[in-house]
Amino acid sequence: MRLAPTTVLLWAWGSLQAFEIVEKENIFQRTPCPAFLVFDNTAYLADMSFELPCHCKPEDVSAVVWYYQKYLGSSHTTVLTDFDGRLLTEAAHVRVGSSMLARFSIRMFSLLVFRAQPEDSGLYFCGTRNGDYFYAYDVDIQSHKGMVASFRDKGQEPLPDEYYGSLHVFTTFWEWTPCDRCGVRGEQWRFGLCYLQNPNLSPRYIKTLPDVVSCGSRAVPWKLHLKTKYHTPELLIQSCLVSCKKNKMGEGILAIYNYVSKLGGRPWVPQVPIQFHQQRLGHGLIISCPGARPEHAVAWDKDSQPLYRTQYLKGVNRSMRVFIDHGNHLHIRFTQLSDRGIYYCWRQGLKIAGFRLGVTSRGRYPASLSDPETRTAVELTLIGYLLIAVVFVTIHLCRCCCQSRCCPNFSAQTLLQL
């Protein structure tokens, strides 16, 4: 009978030893660093956030430093490090247009860049404080300006491939997003980024397919890059219809609702949180969906009217006053009284938020340089004064030149009097 406790004890001790072995196992021991530094090519769309893992490092290195170069061999190298304690935990903390030094974070040896811009394209190195590099990336951030949208419901197809001798330029599409709405007709889409195939690419760049890299890769020679600059990213859109998942209302809210209903009044219970905003008549407004990213399936409704991308996507009509940009933001230019209402936001097929917009034509609002309209008015006023000053000085200079030619005895004192 004493063998049973001994057996259990030995089994437990063996399990602890096995657990200790697994605990000490290091992922970097299974991934040796390359003897010759190469660059892993990757591409993203502007305003996206991306992560670059440091796939290998020596076992004795406890912390990594990320470096950035615009071009290989550049004399200017940016050091990306969080040794000063500056960490960005959420992309919501990052403002649009801020410097990359305010949009990155290092977590578990990986570099995270939020809301990437085309200026962030370049080479990223994972290394140490002493400048020893272990792993490197060739990152291509493609701008969504000039993005071509194709609507399958209208029979439109993506852009055809382009051939220039041995150069093959084409579009590589991401996976389809989920349907942006449920219970009603919705839309889904997928982004397409520019890629090329050519046998004369640098062997230092790792390619997913043989001789294939993104169009903005540093492996592409300048002559080939000029031929690809007109092949912009694409957006393919099609209709979809999915059913909604049943969402059970909380027991507490349901009890209050039933109690008030028995008293004779049925209260209005909003399906999603609603935020109120009051806007001045004639001014612009941009509404963002909470927690949404450019790669998410985001939809907008005004009250019960869906705002489909086939009609409201930016670029469909140049004279559009209300449109949705490629970053899933809703723009209202020159707000009118008819814009009053509740604007609902869908994210990944779920309605998550509402914005009640009120438009007022009365009241005085203090001018602020943070207001785009105020900045535009100040800039136009300064430009007007500058033009008037230039014209004034030009007229007087011409007058002085004419008088000096016609009257040789025209003295400098007379010029000063003018």
Curated annotation (Swiss-Prot):
It comes from Rattus norvegicus (Rat). Belongs to the FAM187 family. The keyword Metal-binding does not apply. It comes from the Eukaryota. Gene3D superfamilies: Immunoglobulins. This is Ig-like V-type domain-containing protein FAM187A. Residues 1-18 form the signal peptide. Residues 267-361 form the Ig-like V-type domain. It is found in: Membrane. Keywords: Disulfide bond, Glycoprotein, Immunoglobulin domain, Membrane, Signal, Transmembrane, Transmembrane helix.
